[in-house]
Structure formats: structure tokens, C-alpha cells
Amino acid sequence: MKSLPKRPEKSLKKNIKNADEKPFKVNYYSDELNDDFAEVVSEHTKLPDDYEYGKKRGALWKANSFILYYGIAYPIVTVYNKLVHGEKIKNRKVLKGYKKEGFFLYGNHTMKAADAFTPPRIIYPKKMNILVNPDAVAKPVVSNLVEKFGGIPVASSLKSMRNFSGKMKKLSEENKAVVIYPEAHIWPYYTGIRPFKDASFKYPAEESKPVFCFTRVFKKRAFRKRPKTVVYVDGPFFPKPEYTVKENQKYLRDCVYEAMKRRAKQSNEEYVKYVKERTDGDDAIRGDAKD
């Protein structure tokens, strides 16, 4: 295989054209677990070890949060996802019967704003509680809004993990809906499912809560270059009573992964192509495109 000069950035993008002159991007990656294409400069915020997840809020704060979420944010995100991405959600019926019960919802991480906007539409009228990067709460004013919209920053250390785990337990006991992106990093318009770890499945395994997943697929759109999105909801998947917590972590992870892989095959438009790039010494070698 012919060696190529090493590029300064592994997330290099090029505009190319296919046979019918339709432009699309190519993202080169080397690590499916850790490469990120969000194009957002991370502040690498670390939460303090004593970060308080269970802050007590008064009636006025709760009322303000309700109005912001249901009266302002929800209508806006619904219109945005429908108009900009042509988003349709299918198979929401599997959630019927679980509106009053707590559950965990996992999704593939393929959009920037839309990935924050889709879960509220899936689980409505339940309010979303979504795991977010600590950068989201770096500034006090923004932190307050993030909390009102259901954002929960992921713990940054083993010490802060204790409070974080306590928050997950409390949400389960209160029958809340928790949204998690197990792939962790954003790959815009990726039509496959990346391998992900089972760490985030510890919580439904410990609390014996049902698990659902949603898979965003990309469909060809008439008269527009960007594809429309269709979101499929699957589940529920339940922890097995005869399994240990660790065994259920793996079991639930595998259930979600296989369901996502199956749904992802329904994508028929590749707006952004992802190409595996291997390294060999000081040279970067371009591999085959990732299907």
C-alpha cells in the first residue's frame, strides 16, 4: 500500500464529488472509540470532587424550568428538527405503558444540536434528563439553563462519581427518563454504529430498569443535498434477574448495540464518508472506507 504524508490533523476533511457530481465530505479517523468530529473546542472542564447533583430547588425555580422546557424549548426543537432535518420518529409505541415508569434511553451520536433536540420528542410528555459533557456547566448562567433543560454533567473523578451515581439512583427511584449517548463522541451523519463500552449500562443493571434505544438513520432527500433523518425507537430490554450487575451491563449493552446495528442498515444516503486511517511509523496510511 502506498504511503501518504502524515496530515497535521487526523480529522482532515476534503470536498469531493461522486459520479453524479454530488459533493460530500470525507472524515479520516483512527480510533472509533475516541475520535471526535464535533468541531467544538473543548474547555476540558473538570467538575469539583464535591459537585452537588441533588441541589434543592424552590417552587419558583421549578415553575420557571417547566415553562422554559415545555412552553419554549420543546416547541422550538420540534419545529427545528422537522424543518431542518425532516425528522420523523417511528415506533414510539414501544414506550406506551412506560410513561409513568423510569427508564434509560440510549442513542447513536450523529448530530450536534439535533441530538439534544430529538430525545424530548421521543419521550414526551416525560421530561428528559440527559448526560452532558462537564463543559456544558462551565459557566454559572449556562449551567443554570442546562440544569433546567435536564442536563446532568458526567463526573470527572472517582470522588465526584459517588455523587453522580447517587443522582442516577435518585432519578431511577423517581421514575425519571435518562438519556445517554454511549458512543460519547459526535460523528456527524455517520451511517454505522461505532463500538461502545458497557460502563453506562451499569445504572439500569443496578436499578433493574427497562432500557430503550433510538437509532437515527439518514435517507435521501429530494432537491436537497443534506439527507433527512428517520429515528427508530426499540425496546424494552430488561436486566435478567439471574444475572449479576456486571453480566447485565454487558447483556443490555449487546441488546442495544445489535438493535442499533440492525436499524442503521436502513440508511440509504451517505452525506459524510468515514475512512479508516492506519498509522505506520511516521507515515499515515489511508485504509478502506468504513461501511
Predicted regions, residues:
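Short, basic, glycine/proline-bearing loop/turn elements
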Residues: 80, 148-155, 183-187
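Membrane-anchoring hydrophobic helices of lipid-metabolizing enzymes
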Residues: 2-104, 114-118, 143, 228, ...
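A conditional alpha-helix N-cap/helix-loop micro-motif detector
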Residues: 85, 157-162, 193-194
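Catalytic core of membrane glycerolipid acyltransferases/transacylases, capturing the structured
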Residues: 98-158
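Structural motif corresponding to alpha-helix initiation and N-cap regions
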Residues: 89-92, 139, 161-165
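Non-catalytic C-terminal accessory region of glycerolipid acyltransferases
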Residues: 2-42, 165-291
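Short amphipathic alpha-helical segments and helix-helix/interface helices
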Residues: 77, 119-120, 143, 168, ...
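Short, glycine/polar-rich helix-capping loops at beta-to-alpha or helix-loop-helix junctions
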Residues: 69, 137-142, 221-223
